[in-house]
């Protein structure tokens, strides 16, 4: 689905060198287009020592998130490596994450919350994290919380309202 969204703008991106498509579980019959590279094929015979470590500073860019586009075209926002320190501290202070916790964040990793508080904050605080693939599902979420004995659960107010509407039958 995401590959289809970028097709119309590829010709306008002068600095684009390659497109690597990840299709681990083969959800799509033919996800590759034109000169796309297949991630699984590229990684098939690669060993860990094949990769060269690149030194970066705290001021180098680490990740780009796109805004939702609710006020115009989505914009790419660059985050620096230094932001990891703030995400670690926020995870510790606001979410009270600590070693030994089992953490479940329902935010999509494609959004800033899913990356910052779904992945980076728990990693840097040394907690076990659960990443769920899929949209809202009251029964699946409750099952995850019970099965994995989740200590800290992070979700959006909208999701809480949806859970409340689901009723007690799914609990």
Model-derived segments and their meaning:
Residues 68-72, 76, 81:
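Conserved phosphate-binding and hydrolysis motifs of nucleotide-dependent enzymes
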Residues 85-105, 109-152, 165-166:
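Conserved AMP-binding/adenylation subdomain of ANL enzymes
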Residues 1-41, 146, 156, 168:
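Structural core segment of the AMP-binding/adenylate-forming
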Residues 82, 158-161:
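Alpha-helix/helix-capping structural signal
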Residues 20-21, 35-36, 40, 44-66, ...:
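Conserved pre-ATP/AMP-binding loop-to-beta segment of ANL
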Residues 1-8, 75-78, 105, 128-135:
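Short beta-strand->loop structural element characteristic of the AMP-binding/adenylate-forming
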Residues 7, 53, 138-142:
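Short hydrophobic/charged patches on amphipathic alpha-helices used for structural packing
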């Amino acid at each position: 689905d995401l590959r289809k969204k970028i097709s119309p703008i590829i010709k306008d991106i002068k600095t684009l060198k390659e497109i690597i498509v990840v299709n681990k579980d083969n959800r799509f019959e033919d996800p590759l287009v034109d000169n796309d590279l297949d991630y699984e094929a590229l990684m098939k015979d690669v060993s860990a020592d094949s990769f060269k470590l690149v030194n970066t500073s705290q001021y180098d860019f680490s990740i780009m998130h796109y805004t939702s586009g609710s006020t115009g075209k989505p914009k790419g926002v660059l985050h620096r490596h230094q932001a990891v320190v703030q995400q670690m501290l926020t995870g510790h202070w606001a979410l009270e994450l600590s070693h030994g916790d089992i953490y479940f964040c329902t935010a999509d990793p494609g959004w800033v919350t899913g990356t910052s508080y779904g992945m980076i904050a728990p990693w840097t605080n040394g907690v076990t994290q659960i990443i769920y693939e899929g949209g809202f599902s009251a029964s699946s979420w409750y099952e995850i919380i019970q099965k994995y004995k989740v200590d800290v659960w992070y979700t959006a107010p909208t999701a809480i309202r949806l859970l409340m509407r689901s009723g007690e039958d799914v609990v």
